[in-house]
Amino acid sequence: MDTKKDIKSLNLEELKTELESMGEKAFRAKQMYEWMHVKLVRSFDEMTNLSAKFREQCKEKYEYTCVNPVRIQESKIDGTKKFLFELSDGNVVESVWMQYKHGNSVCISSQVGCRMGCKFCASTLDGLERNLTPSEMLDQIYAITRLTGERVSNVVVMGTGEPMDNYNNILKFLHLLTDENGLNISQRNVTVSTCGILPRLRQLADEKLQITLALSLHATTDEKRRKLMPIANRYSIKELMEVCQYYFKQTGRRITFEYSLVGGVNDTEEDARELIALAKPLCCHINLIPVNPIKERDYVQSDTKHIQAFKNKLEKNGINVTIRREMGRDIDGACGQLRKKFLER
């Protein structure tokens, strides 16, 4: 039996081609695309300006992907909501909805699990199950929009998974997300986080998208980075910085370096000096992250005073730096924690 095509992963031109092959006029594709990506309906049956016969034909030919909420947690501290969504094959992924003064932000997953093995991340503990499709990534956002009744203005691909390990689907997702015929979210309001698969980053640079690239650095020497991130066994920091220069040259977009502060591991004065030396030649921003403790690892978070002192040292040397605001700490807010607890139940 042939696998049905995933209709929500098609762009408008691809959808036109599909529907024309069924004998429909091009305007039908525009109508259907609006139902899927603007009105965010959950089934063909809700597309009321399409004939019942045509809707039945679509059901037979196409898969209509929707994620289903199985658990929702809300922070009593800041109103952050964490969603655990079930996929059509029974796998689960997590997403986070956060409220800021500038608007609502959603953090989505790009894979079921992760194979990158970063030592301070819960989402990698059980390895990689599979990649998410463009529609499964989109519907995390669509489902949260439906459930909260509020518009999403910013999207962060920083949940479970390594986006560059799912490159083709991520690229398709980004184009669908920012399409003027769909949600029309500005590329500048989209952030993609990566541990740094360098050939893929070069490819992404050549796309010249205006998204924000957030690169997980977390250490200032290859020796330290290898202890925290297995990807550092493949690519050196020198190679990483060269690709960052290329990315900026191609896109004109400042890189964000994510730097998780682990007590006694990468938060010393020497680490600060080395980070300054790495950052100065680049157009970049440093985002300091108080590491989230997970029970399977013995890493501890740097204390607040230490984090502030680290930040001050960078600022005094002209480095653009912030400390990430901790959201949802009372609801398994760290990446992968809610999914892991659900699977262990």
Specify the residue positions occupied by each region the protein language model found.
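Auxiliary Fe-S-binding modules of radical SAM enzymes
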Residues: 1-91, 245-253, 259-345
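A short loop-to-beta-strand scaffold at the N-terminal edge of the catalytic core in hydrolase folds
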Residues: 92-97
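Phospho-regulated, low-complexity intrinsically disordered regions of nuclear gene-regulatory
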Residues: 86, 98-99
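Canonical Radical SAM [4Fe-4S] cluster-binding loop centered on the CxxxCxxC motif
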Residues: 99-136
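Conserved AdoMet/S-adenosylmethionine-binding subsite of the radical SAM
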Residues: 145-154, 159-317
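Conserved alpha-helical substructure of the radical SAM core
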Residues: 124-154
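Short linear Ser/Thr-Pro motifs
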Residues: 75, 109-110, 123, 193, ...
